[in-house]
């Protein structure tokens, strides 16, 4: 239908806080995100293998963004990032979106209760099976819902993330380039060491938007071999998009459309 999809948030399962073994955790929600994106072409996969980016898919950066957003709500639920596409040996409704090239993550409870999911209502050997309302933790569900609503509000108000590239071969500086993003009032350039899991707390630079079709900035003295780079777009109201990494396949659009 020609829609632009910024992100897909799949919530499954998010209503309980106690697991099959009786362990309870009502302070975290797990967010699953893929590493190398599912729609990489062989050419893009080869480029990523040489230049890095296996931990910088749009979905992985969406997960980082959600983690930061959750930290801004002390009374809410904390995000536990799970850096795999889904639970071991299982799948979810976000997977087809990933395969189509759309950034997608899965929200799921911190601990699973296997007796009360995908089960017919019954009692066996004294154990009650089935999805029943008495197993719900509604205050926990409310916190997960609040995080989702805040995420949707921010995603709707933010411009699309850019699609940056980084050039740093055989030079003592790094050039970051990207095309203009409609609705962006400014852009923030981010960096982190290649072995760091999270972006630095402060941007490396800020570029104000204009009417020109593309942008480029040189980071003097920054040897690109040692760093990963990203760019986020910011609306006039100050709402920031997730970061897009300047790596092969780092943009948020499906690669099949390129």
Spans of model-derived segments:
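Beta-strand-rich modules
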Residues: 217-240
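Conserved aromatic anchor
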Residues: 172-184
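Active-site-adjacent mobile loop/cap segments within catalytic or ligand-binding domains
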Residues: 17-30, 82-159
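Extracellular fibronectin type III
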Residues: 234-258
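Extracellular low-complexity, O-glycosylation-prone stalks/linkers
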Residues: 184-204
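Metal-dependent peptidase/peptidase-like ectodomains
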Residues: 1-92, 100, 104
């Amino acid at each position: 239908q020609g829609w632009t999809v910024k992100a897909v948030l799949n919530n499954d399962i998010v209503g309980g806080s106690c697991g099959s073994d009786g362990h309870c955790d009502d302070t975290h929600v797990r967010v699953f995100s893929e590493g190398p994106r599912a729609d990489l072409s062989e050419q893009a996969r080869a480029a990523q293998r040489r230049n890095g980016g296996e931990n910088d898919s749009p979905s992985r950066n969406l997960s980082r963004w959600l983690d930061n957003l959750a930290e801004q709500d002390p009374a809410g639920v904390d995000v536990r990032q799970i850096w795999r596409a889904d639970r071991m040996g299982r799948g979810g409704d976000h997977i087809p979106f990933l395969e189509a090239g759309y950034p997608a993550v899965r929200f799921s409870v911190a601990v699973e209760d296997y007796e009360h999911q995908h089960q017919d209502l019954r009692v066996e050997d004294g154990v009650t099976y089935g999805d029943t309302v008495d197993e719900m933790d509604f205050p926990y569900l409310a916190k997960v819902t609040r995080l989702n609503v805040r995420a949707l509000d921010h995603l709707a108000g933010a411009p699309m993330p850019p699609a940056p590239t980084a050039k740093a071969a055989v030079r003592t500086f790094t050039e970051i380039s990207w095309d203009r993003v409609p609705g962006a009032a400014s852009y923030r350039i981010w960096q982190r060491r290649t072995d760091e899991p999270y972006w630095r707390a402060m941007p490396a630079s800020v570029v104000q938007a204009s009417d020109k079709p593309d942008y480029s900035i040189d980071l003097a003295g920054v040897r690109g071999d040692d760093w990963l780079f990203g760019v986020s777009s910011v609306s006039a109201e100050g709402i920031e998009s997730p970061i897009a990494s300047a790596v092969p396949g780092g943009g948020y659009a499906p690669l099949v459309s390129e």
